[in-house]
Every structure is written in C-alpha cells, then in structure tokens.
Regions:
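Short beta->alpha connector loops at strand-helix junctions that form conserved
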Residues: 1-7
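PLP-dependent aminotransferase class I/II
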Residues: 4, 24-28, 33-38, 46, ...
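Active-site phosphate-binding strand-loop segment of PLP-dependent enzymes
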Residues: 8-86, 91-101
Length: 279
C-alpha cells in the first residue's frame, strides 16, 4: 500500500491513506521527527504497529513516552552516523514474548539453542532425531554483535540524553532561521530527537545552488533519505499507482546536512550567512 508523505513530519500524509482495513503498519520516525502514531491507531485500530527508530533515538510522544515503546516492536540502528554507535549493528525492542524469542534465534542462524531454557527443552523434545546443538527452527542470519561493540554502545548510552538535548537546541535554531520563502519548514515538535537539518527547496531548481554552497563550505550533504521510493528500481513498476506530489518535492528539492552534539551555533550561523549571501 502506497501513500504520500507529510511535508512537516516526513511521515504518512493522512489524507492519502487508504480507507480499507490495514493489518500491519511499519512507521518510520524519519530524521528524528515525530510520526503521528496516535492518529494512525485511530484510523487503523486493529493493525499491528512496528516502529523504525533508526535515526530517532529518544524521540518522544506528546504524552512523554519514548517512541519505540508503543507498538509490537521497534528497530534501532547504532550505525556510525546515528545518535549513538556501536560502529555497526543495532537492536530490536519488544514487550511481546513470542517476538522476543523469534528475534533471538533469527539473529543467530535460526538455532534453537538461543531460546529461553524451557522453550529450548521443548524444541529438543519435539525433534528427538536432530542434534540439539544444531537444531534450526527457522531461517536466520548471523547478526550477533560483539562484546567490543557492546562496550562502545554502553559508554555512549550514558551521554545519550545530554546529546539529544544539544541536538534539539540545534534543531530549534535551524527551524527559527531557515527562510520559509525558500524552504518547506519541518515541524519543530518538542519531543523531536533531531538527526539532521533538512532543506527542502520550494523551487526544485534551487537545490543545485544549495548543494554548491554546502560544497564550498566543505559540508557533506545527502538527499532526504531515499526521496520518492517509487522512483527506485525495486518499486518502479508501482510508480503510477498513487499520486505522491509531496514525496516528489522531497525527492527533487530536498537535501540535508548533519546535526549532532558537535555542531555549534557558530557553525550554523556560518551556514545561514552563506545561504543569505550567495542565494
């Protein structure tokens, strides 16, 4: 099921969502912005909700609960460029016992010996002709992380809340200084956990000018994640299945630069001064 995106949250455009019953909703809190799960749950009360928090560690719902705790499960990425890192890898959170047990064996080739003891015993009893040390209950992957990666992550976890506050302060400055005549402004939700500064040009032809300014400043820039996914080869056959004008605005007019606890106000002033001077 395809729909358009909202230009303030980069999440679902509620007006383009289908009316039929949906079984599963995988919702992404993109670039640290807050996606409207509460609205979606009202629209699809029987759906299972899975959350993607890969770029949004610590983003909060209006009631103060952290995102990633309101659905069946949530994915977090600890890739090098995210809020905290274990160099590579990530984690899955869930309060569902069945999903928890499944994910444990999925990350380790599907082997039964990773189950909790009582379930492992049951699997052995149900499969007496198979060596219990190499009993595969499902297809799986080799996604086990290492102790070294865990040490790095645990140390960064101690500073995560402080770093998120610095990111929020930076994002607040960004939203209050970006020119609304030139750019679409993302929603400055107080619960955000900003990952980046997204510049979405109202005139798509201005994007190359903006990129050249960043290049002159030596600032790495990227598209707004994937832009319009329906233009990518693996989904292109469905590109005409739905009208997505907002996704196209992100695709053709959008670019982002990174936000982090290491970004200072002086750095941001330099960026905005360059845009004003060279536009």
């Amino acid at each position: 099921v395809f729909c358009d995106v909202d230009l303030e949250t980069y999440s679902f455009d509620m007006d383009t969502l289908p009316e039929e019953d949906i079984r599963i909703v995988f919702i992404t809190h993109l670039l640290g912005l807050n996606s409207p799960i509460e609205q979606l749950k009202k629209k699809y009360p029987n759906a299972i909700f899975l959350e993607d928090i890969c770029e949004s560690h610590g983003v909060k719902a209006p009631n103060g609960m952290k995102r990633g705790s309101t659905g069946l499960g949530a994915t977090f990425s600890f890739y090098y460029g995210h809020h905290m890192t274990t160099i590579e890898g990530g984690m899955i959170c869930t309060d569902n016992e069945d999903l928890y047990e499944l994910m444990k064996i999925k990350r380790s080739h599907g082997m039964a010996r990773l189950l909790s003891p009582h379930l492992y015993k049951e699997a052995i009893e149900n499969n007496p002709d198979i060596d219990p040390a190499f009993l595969f209950l499902t297809d799986g992957y080799n996604f086990r992380n290492t102790e070294l990666n865990a040490v790095i992550g645990l140390e960064q976890l101690k500073r995560l809340d402080e770093n998120i506050k610095l990111r929020r302060d930076n994002f607040d400055y960004f939203v209050n200084n970006v020119d609304p005549n030139l750019f679409y402004i993302p929603y400055n939700d107080p619960g955000n956990s900003s990952f980046a500064f997204p510049f979405v040009c109202k005139n798509p032809e201005d994007r190359e000018k903006l990129k050249s300014i960043f290049d002159e400043l030596g600032i790495e820039h990227r598209p707004i994640v994937s832009g319009n996914l329906l233009l990518h080869p693996f989904l292109k056959k469905w590109k005409d299945s739905v009208s997505v004008p907002n996704a196209n605005k992100l695709n053709y007019g959008g670019v982002y630069i990174g936000n982090s606890q290491f970004i200072t106000k002086d750095m941001m002033v330099k960026v905005f001064d360059a845009i004003k001077t060279k536009w």
